Amino acid sequence: MKNGFRQSMAWLHTWTGLLVGWLLLLIFMAGTASYYREEISRWMRPELPSSNVSIDVAAQRAVDYLQANATQAENWFVTLPQPRNPAMQMFWRLPPELADPSRGRRGGFGDATLDPNTGQALKARETRGGDFFYRLHFDLHYIPVLWARYLVGFCAMFMLVAIITGVITHKKIFKDFFTFRKDKGLRSWLDFHNVSAVMALPYHAMITYTGIVTLMIMYLPWGVKVAYPQDEDKFFSEAFGGMPEVTAPAEGRATPLPIAQLLDSARAHWHGVEVAGFTVSNPGAANAVIDIRQRDGKRLSTDTPAVRYDMVSGALLEETPPSGGATATRGVLYGLHLARFADWGLRALFFLSGLVGCLMVASGVVLWAVKERPKHAKSGRIGFGLRLVDALNIGTVAGLPIAFAAYFWGNRLLPLDIAERSSAEANVFFYAWGGALLAAFIWPKRMMWAWQLYLGAAAFALVPVVNALTTHAHLGITLRNGDWVLAGFDLSMIAFGAMLALCGWRMQRWTPPLSAAEKKKRAAAAAAPKAPVEAAEAAEAEASA
């Protein structure tokens, strides 16, 4: 570690960023994509139509379907069509005696996806859609969830340290924000890293800190263990508890009120806020109750209000109790992280800020290699550490976009009837990334950067083509119908392809600038006295001229 406070902070900034940089880039890219997870999920299930009916009509069709197909269920769970996701999804829980033991834990549940326009069940392809990226950015993949969340929390804490030490290290950080020196080697990379860091600095700090807060009880459990030594469940019930679960068994039979009347009561209670979905306990019974959930978009907090009504009389039984100060604060911080409250403009701003964060992390790991290379050039050989970093940089910075595009290709090209299809799509993502990493380790040279960037560009740009060849929801139809969710996805793929192609072209044409030592060596060679033979040839040429 260097002497002096600022030098010490620079050392800490470098190593906290580098050691977790590649995993952090995966987390940042997956988290940024998650801002549009509903739109991604819709594109990845092209069989689902747009909703052209009101919430009340859709809810009535859901109830009609459940009354016909899940009469013996103990509970119904319904998610109504939303502006960003027109699908109407539902599942129901069966009594233990009707559960199918061959299906394990799933044997006690049924599920369906309905067309809200007709009330008919739809057969959509099995996919995780955008939820894959959402879970990936904090649960990772292939490893136990608990380990993954500890690892992601470790990376987030390192990221927070890197942000703080970066601000301390760059005393002219805001002045440097307006400075970019082109084609200056190390200086250019440092300028780019500074610009991408300062451009969205409040966002970087917010998203990192709130990411840690979302799992704070997992990372700092000791307070709960001390205050609730014998019953930790009591803590969660008191801190996050909503309405108590309905445990009373069904009693008798009765005709419920129309679902539209109950939804109107909930809207009136919330002063006009729309409904997201509902849960029915003891459907069809005289003591049936319905819990109605409020739609996201009007609150910063992730704490979703709900109200409970008697389905027969329509009486308001209870509502979600107000949160305490600490719980409300956590809910707001969690809400800032997820941005469910954002309209289309604010969501786009969050997404762009996330992309800038990806550039910041990527430029940081590349900057270390650029800075180290002249030191290795003096010795005439590249050490193992630099080769490792070069390979990881190529395989992650240039390879991850290939994996993201491959995931979308897998959604369109994998057979619709294969078992565990959603897992197969995830495997395609990691096979593509693994291939990019392997190629980078075999040949970690500058041209590998260009080749992988070009491959990523082609993969993204051809997604709309593959979509047009395999589904009916292509640009020719979506643009004509004004379906801007699906059209916007395809156009975004083309835009990402163009940006990656530009990066590949720049990398292909880029010539590393000479180091100061190399410049000095060449200048000395040019100024050295010419050899006798060369001098004679020069004199003869001059005489003949």
Predicted regions and their residues:
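Conserved histidines in hydrophobic membrane contexts and catalytic metal-binding motifs
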Residues: 1-545
